[in-house]
Amino acid sequence: MTKKNYNQVSMPYVDLLKSYVKERFIPFHTPGHKIGHGAPKDLRDWMSEALPYDLGVMYALDDLHEPEGAFKEAQELAADLYGAKAAWYSVNGTTALIMTMIMATVGEEESLIIPREVHKSVMSGLVMSGAKPIYLPSRFDEEWGIQLGASLEDLVSTLDAHPEAKAVLLVYPNYYGLGIDIEAMVAECHKRGLIVLVDEAHGPHLPFDDRLPVEALEAGADLVAQSTHKSLGSLTQTSTLLGQGDRIDYRRVTQVHQMLQSTSPNYIFMASLDMARQQMATEGPNLVGKAVDLAYQLRTGIQAIPGLKTMDESQLAKNFDPTKVLIDARDLGIDAVAFERRLRDHKIEVELIQACHVLVTITIGDSEASIQALLTALKEISQECLEEGRYSSPIPSLDQVNLALPEPILIKTPRQAFYVSRETIHLAEACGRICGETISYYPPGIPLISIGEEITPAVIQYMKDKQALGYVPNGAADMSLETIVVLKD
């Protein structure tokens, strides 16, 4: 079969949408604002040029669910750019795509190997599919207070212990830009006949600069979900699913994808994916290369500021993404909340605050000016803390406040647990009951207990120890943890 030659400069869906709007049809269809005429004045003033492109579903503009024309070509162009066999665009974010990957590959009572520290969409996918989770051991760096991802050795031991597993879901890279030995892991899974799914939400920029880690698709993964909007130029909640090889059922992926996407997709969102793909095809190496340069410039600048430090690949990770910059302020004598507050006073908004550090992301949207603004703010904060005498009282090391997580005991699959009635009882009475909520602490950001798991004495003691240290549970209905939600017997 002859390989199709794609014109990566083209934007077929954008061209179709623009052409349709130029026709100036009089709309007797949804949406109700009728190309902006019925929109609130504030909305018209704000989005007057965009509103004519916010159109209802119609055959003239192709169909996200069953594309045959320009949108089909747009997805084919995305697959071609990334070297995939197929691509599926999403207007429901990577959340829907992660659920799609799970539901398309594992079913009721089938086993899926996953990290403990996964996005909540994985749990949703387990509920929808009925699959049984098998957890990889969690690794946590106590100095930096972050998850490291699974090791190859842990994956091998888990595979040995669970030969019944049908698929593996890996997170690569993680929120902090930390990678895993993805190539060796994929090879090990494939050797045993398992399907490899990858949550690559934070990695759509990886193929465009040699200083960045190998992307999951090149490493051999079967299905890869990317948040195109996170590090590239499409609009928020737009994402891309990429598939390759013969281990997956493409018809089933398409069927599940149709189930989980809105039947009223926003055409502006869809067009932004086409634009972002064309931008990377024509300018990707230049744009991403510049972002990587700026990230290294920022790192060098931070290292020269008293009281601040930043993590790099020499300290922790294989396959490290330098555009994720973790800034630690413990030596300034302030925690992450105070650090973030001071940054906001300087009009700097960060991606994440956790424990004693903040995370900033450098993308194709950054510039010399934005980097200099951040460095200026950091220098001024450092000087402020020095003048306040905070340097003399640094924040304690994280290894003084982190506790070893107890091993989870799964009693019911997430799906089984989801459909059981729940009740709230006192924590003191909860030992031996099945948990009806998922509870985590930050750090380490790894679930202490999830829905369907047994509440053991070790779990209760962990809660008490964390509470004594002043930590607040995430995900608990009762933040004081005097009570806890459990499944009814």
Model-derived segments and spans:
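N-terminal "arm"/small-domain region of PLP-dependent enzymes with the aminotransferase-like
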Residues: 1-69, 444
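Conserved PLP-enzyme active-site core in the AAT-like
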Residues: 13-18, 22-24, 42-44, 94-312
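Conserved N-terminal alpha-helix of the aminotransferase class I/II PLP-enzyme fold
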Residues: 51-94
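A short linear hydrophobic-aromatic micro-motif
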Residues: 86-88, 226, 347-351, 473-474
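Short acidic (Asp/Glu) and glycine-rich catalytic loops that position anionic groups and cofactors
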Residues: 250-254, 272-281, 318-323, 352-358, ...
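Conserved PLP-binding catalytic core of the aspartate aminotransferase-like
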Residues: 288-343, 358-376, 380, 401-419, ...
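Short amphipathic beta-strand starts and helix->beta connectors
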Residues: 306-313, 343-348, 431-439
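PLP-dependent enzyme catalytic core of the Aspartate aminotransferase-like
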Residues: 351-489
